[in-house]
């Protein structure tokens, strides 16, 4: 209630600071040294960026969030054409450049100090300019512990949302019970799959899963583009991008100062907090896979490519839901208000092959779940092993299990509110 303004100013500072690094003399620095070469192809790199950075969340909110803003916008009246345009602009704000700027800066700092200054790939290394050699003593330990806690609870939020969506999807498709017991069983099963992926390592586990996520997501995206309101989606993608950019400064610096409600706390500040809590995990993971890239390539790629992909996904799925509502074709909003986790499944009910696409959506949620869990486990594992890129298998298994346990405890303790 008292520090919303600080969040707003901070995330804008992060974005401008990241762009400064890209276009200043520092943009020519190569992560890992002058002769370093990238470990992964651009395609695999982009796939891992997107899967780790957004993953489950974008599947959960791509349909639901635009509809919520459509019915209850921060300004003006809801359920109008103007409200639909503002809904997409607001959703773009929450999932756009600011989120990726947070990840970009954390990842850049970790990569530079680790690969160019031969320091551990651990969160403490970022603070070396301020703490000096103390980063190797108890202050550094405290920093890494806080990073581990932020990662565990940030991941637990997304994993909890993901398992709610899987459970709701199974209930929607197969009429299986959508109960707390079902969700806990799903967490255990999917955490087991994530553990197997973690043991397999980065190249055999996370990389292959990320590529599968992108491929399956592309199939669903093409499906909705072809069988959905194709022209509307393409038109609105261009218009949404223009609206986002033209209103960028107004939206980015808006603090609800002249209309005191809880809307911004519930949405924008929640998102900025969520992305910041994810930044140790995603930043560390991005740093781990970005060796060999120049600072300019790194910053611009991490900022722009996932943002454009995210915007296309939101426009295709969220835009299709708005199209159905504006034309009175279907009432997706009522279903979303009843159970937000079923939003994408109810959307598919309005197109052919609904059972096939709903099943594919469930598989994609599970795959993103596993990807987030195993990449998060690798990051926490690195934090707790002094920045080592390879650690004992038992330690990786422990952290993969711990993430599932935290998500299960939060679900049992308070459901969506606790998450």
Where are these regions (language model features)?
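Membrane-water interface regions at transmembrane-helix termini and the short interhelical loops
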Residues: 1, 18-37, 87-94, 109-119, ...
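Flexible loop linkers connecting adjacent transmembrane helices
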Residues: 1, 23-42, 67-90, 112-138, ...
């Amino acid at each position: 209630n008292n520090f919303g303004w600080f969040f707003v100013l901070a995330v804008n500072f992060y974005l401008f600071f990241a762009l400064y690094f890209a276009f200043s003399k520092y943009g020519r620095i190569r992560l890992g040294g002058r002769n370093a070469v990238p470990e992964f192809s651009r395609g695999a790199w982009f796939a891992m960026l997107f899967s780790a950075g957004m993953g489950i969340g974008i599947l959960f909110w791509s349909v639901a969030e635009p509809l919520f803003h459509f019915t209850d916008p921060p300004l003006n009246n809801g359920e109008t054409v103007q409200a639909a345009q503002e809904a997409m602009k607001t959703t773009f704000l929450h999932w756009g450049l600011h989120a990726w700027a947070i990840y970009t800066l954390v990842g850049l700092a970790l990569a530079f100090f680790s690969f160019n200054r031969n320091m551990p790939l651990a969160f403490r290394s970022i603070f070396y300019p301020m703490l000096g050699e103390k980063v190797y003593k108890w202050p550094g330990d405290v920093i890494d512990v806080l990073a581990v806690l932020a990662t565990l609870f940030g991941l637990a939020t997304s994993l909890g949302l993901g398992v709610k969506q899987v459970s709701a999807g199974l209930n929607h498709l197969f009429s299986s019970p959508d109960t707390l017991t079902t969700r806990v069983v799903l967490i255990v099963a999917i955490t087991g799959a994530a553990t197997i992926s973690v043991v397999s390592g980065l190249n055999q586990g996370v990389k292959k899963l990320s590529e599968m996520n992108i491929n399956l997501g592309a199939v669903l995206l093409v499906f909705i583009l072809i069988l959905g309101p194709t022209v509307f989606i393409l038109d609105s993608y261009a218009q949404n991008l223009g609206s986002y950019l033209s209103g960028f400064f107004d939206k980015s610096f808006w603090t609800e100062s002249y209309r005191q409600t809880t809307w911004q706390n519930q949405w924008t500040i929640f998102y900025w907090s969520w992305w910041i809590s994810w930044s140790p995990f995603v930043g560390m993971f991005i740093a781990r896979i970005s060796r060999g890239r120049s600072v300019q390539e790194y910053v611009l790629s991490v900022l722009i490519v996932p943002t454009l992909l995210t915007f296309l996904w939101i426009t295709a799925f969220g835009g299709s839901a708005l199209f159905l509502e504006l034309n009175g074709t279907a009432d997706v909003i009522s279903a979303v208000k009843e159970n937000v986790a079923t939003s994408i499944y109810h959307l598919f009910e309005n197109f052919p092959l609904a059972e096939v696409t709903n099943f594919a959506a469930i598989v994609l949620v599970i795959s993103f779940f596993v990807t987030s869990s195993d990449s998060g486990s690798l990051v926490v594992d690195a934090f707790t092993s002094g920045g080592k890129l390879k650690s004992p298998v038992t330690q990786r298994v422990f952290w993969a299990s711990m993430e599932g346990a935290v998500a299960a405890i939060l679900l049992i303790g308070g459901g969506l509110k606790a998450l």
